[in-house]
C-alpha cells in the first residue's frame, strides 16, 4: 500500500516585490509622518482615509482592447460584478471622494492622506510593489493662491522633519508657459495640430530628460533623434532649428533673479495668451510666497522643472534636497527630488463631466526618510522595554506586580514569558530587545525586600572599553529596596536619554 503523500509545507517568504518592516523602520516612518501631519493640520487640511480597494472604473486604469485591467494594478473580478483593484496612488481615490460627496464636502475641500499604495510593476533594487505615499490636495480652488500655499506648506513640512534651510529648494514652473512656448514655436497651430501632437509629446519627454541628457542630448531628441545607452535609436521630434532653440531656451530660462527669469519667459512665449497667463501666474505665486516670508532661497521660479509637465495643467513644483551623499557606487551626488506636485484641473471631470480645479503635492515617504537617515535627522530608535526576569516560577505574580508598578509610572516594561530555566537566555533575550534595564529578584532578594537592577547599556559599555578600576567604580548592577525600583529605573533611563 502506497504511503500517502505529505502535504508540502508553505514557504515562509514575502512575495516578489514586497518586504516587511520591523521596529525602528516603522517608528521612524511614523514619527516623520506625524510631524508632516502636524504641518498639514496647521495649514487647515483635514485627514482622509479611503479604502485600499477601488473599482477599476474609478481608478481609470484598464486596457481598451481587452476585458482584463492594466497590468499596472493588482485587480480581480468578483463573479460578474465590477473589476476591483488595489489603489495605485492616493489621488485617484480623492477624485472619487470629491465626486461622490460633492454635495456634502466644503468647497474648496482641503485634505491630506497617508498610506500604502500598490503597483503591479516589475520590482528592482529599491523599487517595491507596495510603498507609502503622503499627499495633500486642495479641490475646488481655481486661484493660484492654492498652489502657492501648497508650496509653502511643503517647505514648512521639510523643515519640520529636520531638513534645514539651505539643504532644500522647492522649484516652481507652469505647464501653461510651456504650452505658450510650443505655440510660439508653431506647434499648436490648428491647421497642423494632428501632425504636431506627436511632436509635442516627444518634445515634452525630451525636455523631461534635460537633467540627465543635458542640452546636446535634448537638442538631438528635438531634432532627428539619438542613440540611447543601449545603442537603440530613439526617434526625435524632427523640429526646425529655430523651434529647437525656442524650446531649449525654455528649459534654460532661469536667470539670476526671479524678475529676470519672468522677463525671459515672457520673451519666449511671444504673443501666446496661454503662455502670458502662465507667466503672470508664476509672478503671482512669487508675490504671494514673498508676502508669507518664503524667499527664493526656499521656493524659486525655475523653468527647468519639467517632471510631470505632461500631466499637470498649470503650476508644477518639485522639492529637491541639495546636500550631497554617497551613492551605491561610492560617488558623491546631490540627494535629489523627494516631493512633487502641481495643478490638475481635470481631477473630478471624469466622474461629473464638469471641470473641477485642484492642486496638490505628494511626498516620497521612503526617499525623504532615507534623506533624514543620511543627515542623521531620523528619530533615533526608542529603547526597548525594561525586562523583569523570572528567577522562581512560583512567584510569577510577584514579578508581574513589578511590571505593573513600572507601567503605572509610564515606564515601558515586560515580563519574560519564555522558558525561565536558563537565566542566561533571559539576558540574551533582553539584549535582543535592546532593553536598557533588567530587573532581577531571587528568593534571597525577595526575603530581604530588595531587587537587583542591571544597567544593560552601562554594562555593555564597561565590557567594551573600561579598565578594571573603572569597572569597580561604575558597577552596572545595583541592589536597591523594592520601594526604590521605579526611581532607580527612571534614573538609569534618564542617563541614557
From Swiss-Prot:
Coiled coil ranges: none
Entries under CDD domains matching the protein: HisRS-like_core, HisRS_anticodon
Keyword presence, Phosphoprotein: no
Any Gene Ontology biological process: histidyl-tRNA aminoacylation
Domain of life: Bacteria
GO cellular component: a single term: cytoplasm
The entry's keywords: Aminoacyl-tRNA synthetase, ATP-binding, Cytoplasm, Ligase, Nucleotide-binding, Protein biosynthesis
Protein's cellular compartments: Cytoplasm
Enzyme Commission number(s): 6.1.1.21
Keyword Aminoacyl-tRNA synthetase: yes
Protein name: Histidine--tRNA ligase
Protein's gene: hisS
Subunit-level organization: Homodimer.
Major localization class: cytoplasm
GO molecular function: ATP binding; histidine-tRNA ligase activity
Catalytic reaction annotation: tRNA(His) + L-histidine + ATP = L-histidyl-tRNA(His) + AMP + diphosphate + H(+)
